[in-house]
Amino acid sequence: MSQFSKDQVQDMYYLSPMQEGMLFHAILNPGQSFYLEQITMKVKGSLNIKCLEESMNVIMDRYDVFRTVFIHEKVKRPVQVVLKKRQFHIEEIDLTHLTGSEQTAKINEYKEQDKIRGFDLTRDIPMRAAIFKKAEESFEWVWSYHHIILDGWCFGIVVQDLFKVYNALREQKPYSLPPVKPYKDYIKWLEKQDKQASLRYWREYLEGFEGQTTFAEQRKKQKDGYEPKELLFSLSEAETKAFTELAKSQHTTLSTALQAVWSVLISRYQQSGDLAFGTVVSGRPAEIKGVEHMVGLFINVVPRRVKLSEGITFNGLLKRLQEQSLQSEPHQYVPLYDIQSQADQPKLIDHIIVFENYPLQDAKNEESSENGFDMVDVHVFEKSNYDLNLMASPGDEMLIKLAYNENVFDEAFILRLKSQLLTAIQQLIQNPDQPVSTINLVDDREREFLLTGLNPPAQAHETKPLTYWFKEAVNANPDAPALTYSGQTLSYRELDEEANRIARRLQKHGAGKGSVVALYTKRSLELVIGILGVLKAGAAYLPVDPKLPEDRISYMLADSAAACLLTHQEMKEQAAELPYTGTTLFIDDQTRFEEQASDPATAIDPNDPAYIMYTSGTTGKPKGNITTHANIQGLVKHVDYMAFSDQDTFLSVSNYAFDAFTFDFYASMLNAARLIIADEHTLLDTERLTDLILQENVNVMFATTALFNLLTDAGEDWMKGLRCILFGGERASVPHVRKALRIMGPGKLINCYGPTEGTVFATAHVVHDLPDSISSLPIGKPISNASVYILNEQSQLQPFGAVGELCISGMGVSKGYVNRADLTKEKFIENPFKPGETLYRTGDLARWLPDGTIEYAGRIDDQVKIRGHRIELEEIEKQLQEYPGVKDAVVVADRHESGDASINAYLVNRTQLSAEDVKAHLKKQLPAYMVPQTFTFLDELPLTTNGKVNKRLLPKPDQDQLAEEWIGPRNEMEETIAQIWSEVLGRKQIGIHDDFFALGGHSLKAMTAASRIKKELGIDLPVKLLFEAPTIAGISAYLKNGGSDGLQDVTIMNQDQEQIIFAFPPVLGYGLMYQNLSSRLPSYKLCAFDFIEEEDRLDRYADLIQKLQPEGPLTLFGYSAGCSLAFEAAKKLEEQGRIVQRIIMVDSYKKQGVSDLDGRTVESDVEALMNVNRDNEALNSEAVKHGLKQKTHAFYSYYVNLISTGQVKADIDLLTSGADFDMPEWLASWEEATTGVYRVKRGFGTHAEMLQGETLDRNAEILLEFLNTQTVTVS
């Protein structure tokens, strides 16, 4: 408070919680326009600016908030200080000499600068105004203030008083204003509230709420920072009137009605009917007499929780929300961060709704119509720390604004939100008694786009049985090789004849149309002969993997009513052990040659079953899916995702009981190509498999995603001859796809998606490129012969971009399940968009991406895919629950960072059980890939308030028992660190294996924790270590090794890049200062050094550089005083024989003398330097200020005594600020320091601005020019 004397102070008191939050953001983001309110008004008529300025000074005197500054340093708790007197000045700018477009440009430039300028709340008047004169009676008024002093509800009061005074002064008449209550009365009221009672209310209100209501799927992933943008629109006068009447009919407010509509809209973007978002409440307690006339910041953000129970109507929802509002009103003063602490998840609110009014025109006109001017085209700019805000203002035509962060949301998405909001309001006005679940947000235009614009046009191809297509391939080239296995090859003619013999034998034993033949074989030529033989007999085949548990095979044979079992002679004994009483035939029985080799006379319909494939089921037993001949034709004939040729050689690496084999077999056999079947030994050896690809000149293959990743890691040569690799079954790994794309080139990789019920895959994504920003691969677009719809639970189309259930129709949709009419009816429904077609509900979640491809978004249920196998976790749970001694069980699948997944079981046991016993039981019932990797025994399963298992509370599977889950500190040092973390993170108990960031940490808290550790333990812990080893155990291990990586003085940014820049810190002393710079140089690894306080700093810098770049020319960088440090380091490196190619310097002069400064001057300069360098978030915290001062003081003391002498061979590139470019003595000072090339360029901004914000963007372009300049280095 040194800038103000006690005589200037009228009052002092604490801040409201909302003010504290805004002050925090102002400190955290200096120079940014968070919570800046900027109102622009065009004024027509006679405006007396001097009179207006005098009127605003009257308002300044009247309301304490306009004379308030905010102090947060050297006080235990921030306070607001009311000054007795402050003088307000309106800036006048005459633009009458400019053209209209020039005037607009000047005003826009001022507005942008005004936003960037912000307010220094510790000293500035928190309000300013500028009036631009455009013509004699045409003005533009820009009025800005910080939201910390005023909210929208107050603005009408202020404006009304302002114009009352203005009119009186203009007409030289007296005026009188009623007395006002100070804002301090509200602060006093706050301190008297029973906060604990209110916290209990919010805890009960939020109990059971899980997740977060967010538009996460619509967020961009490319940019950081906040770029404000808004979309304004309004309801028509008739719609506004009808909507208002609707609210009144249910005795609620227009604000509550808008919240109800928004709830309906956002529910379509969630997978829950339990929603929460922020609402801005007026916060004016009725207990304070005259509160409606008080001015200040009263508003607060509180959560609005909305439960859309089944069948609830819009009118019912309005009543429920109004009741909630009344109940919560006494507790709406509680700050959001305290309410947040009562919730079960780390972040409760993602976006907010604001219903307020800026009645400038109304307030002005209320006072007088004789004041000589009119205000038109009033525009309000405001920016919060939420990426999306829905704002509305009442009026004859209700104004709605979607204010958003353009770096996070696309304009196209915001436009869709607008359309959906208007569509919902229009429907609800017409029928408020309809269930909200039936409201359709998709208008006619979007509906047409979703139905026809995103799906391929229907194709009129005649369907034929598979035997027809195979015979066509045989006739086309009978002597061409068709099938190869383990060195044996059959031509198309030979394969056809062998299949015909098997078909005839099957028919003699009663297998034909309408029957099922089980194929119980190994990978072999006979496998394919058997499949074709079954089809030619008119039957459907049932692939049975001999490795499956006997009980599972028995169930499949019985459930499918298999008429025959077809196997090999060598598997005769194994087959005999099966509990099967039907006919068993042998594919390789020599008596088959007794049968004729010609085609059997069989009438096959394309809609006849071709095979039955069993997949995991929720009942505890697998379910058999029936796939027809026509289904398979839709997959491999007349398709658009790739072209097939009789010159292709396919490789099959899939289990024949897995539907990927369907593609291998039919795509090759029905298109006259060659099929190579890899044997079991080859499948288990990546080297043998890649050798086989090369030896057999394979050019097409389908692999599960897991196998594709494995092969991609195995080498490159095998990919070079392939013209197409298809992969699917799990989420694709972007790094693996990127590697394969680099080797194979565009258009040769296809990511496939589809369930067994959709016949292998229904969508395909042909990879042409992979932008650096991409983090997941789309599953593509619907293939020809298929249509895809993304629907909600009511089978309505989801809005474009919203997540919903992916549903498939078209030729690939199967007939349903064997003996499961109930499940078939549930999952296979009539297509509501194409009468006569069947629609399959996959249970998968997905959404349309802007480019018309589809993004997979998980499962509705607990089904997972592991290594391509579809697994119902319920099936495993039911098997566990049936095991004697198990009281209850739950199974979860965890996806690791590597992309691998594991199944983990949690059991509550009645008697003492061992994991080995349970695992042995499951192995008898389930395929090996369904047996959990871990078994954890609990006393009871954690439950939600709804009685469901709370899977989020299950312990990590690598922990033994729940009671042993937490491991506390092991020594005094760990206890101290745990206590620091506890205070910084607001957590009561910290274990040594708890992740700092998982507990709510972020970069600012990491800086705070590191500063506290140094202060209390004397350990100089690099902040970057918390990102690399974010547990107390990890820190301990690091310290035991003495920080043995040797890199504690360097922060490495853009770690994956190869080209390195070594950056020396400015006088503030921390490499983190270059965090913003690194984002503008994404192609360079930026190794940013901290200032090393020890005297051998140059040797240590040289050692670090040697570790990080052992060879090759070096690039050094410095900003301000860091340039001198870089120069000294370059001399040391050149002495050691290293080649320094260039030193890039930003705004520095060569130090040629010692500065004569005493300790007090150093201290004040350090304080000033820290104030200038507050742009970086990580360096802007009171908690780290002591550490920053120490580091800055050390560097400053070194720098003032430094004299830069000698020369380097390195080139020197100097980028100066605009002002320094005009100082020739600065420009020349570094030229004599190099025998190499010396370049100077004029940059943008002042010295302090050069590496900040938009100025940095422009200067980074010049730095890139320097970096891209090639010079010859002579050693």
Curated annotation (Swiss-Prot):
Which parts of the sequence carry O-(pantetheine 4'-phosphoryl)serine?
1003
Signal peptide per UniProt: none
Q: Which GO terms describe its molecular function?
A: ligase activity; phosphopantetheine binding
Co-factor binding comment: Binds 1 phosphopantetheine covalently.
Which residues fall in a coiled-coil region? none
Source superkingdom: Bacteria
What UniProt keywords are attached to this protein's entry? Antibiotic biosynthesis, Ligase, Phosphopantetheine, Phosphoprotein, Sporulation
Tell me which cofactor or cofactors this protein depends on. pantetheine 4'-phosphate
Its pathway, per UniProt, is: Antibiotic biosynthesis; surfactin biosynthesis
- The answer on whether this UniProt entry bears the keyword Transport reads no
**UniProt GO cellular component terms:** cytoplasm; cytosol
Q: Which residues form the Carrier domain?
A: 968-1043
Active-site residues (renumbered):
1120, 1147, 1247
| GO BP of this protein | amino acid activation for nonribosomal peptide biosynthetic process; antibiotic biosynthetic process; lipid biosynthetic process; secondary metabolite biosynthetic process; sporulation resulting in formation of a cellular spore
Per the record's keyword annotation, is Lipid biosynthesis included, yes or no?
Answer: no
- Give the residue ranges for region: Thioesterase: 1059-1271
Task: Enumerate the InterPro entries for this protein.
Answer: AA_adenyl_dom, AB_hydrolase_fold, ACP-like_sf, AMP-bd_C, AMP-bd_C_sf, AMP-binding_CS, AMP-dep_synth/lig_dom, CAT-like_dom_sf
NCBIfam families, from UniProt?
Answer: AA-adenyl-dom
Give the protein's biological function: Probably activates a leucine.
Question: What is this protein's record name?
Answer: Surfactin synthase subunit 3
Query: Which organism does this record belong to?
Result: Bacillus subtilis (strain 168)
Gene symbol?
srfAC
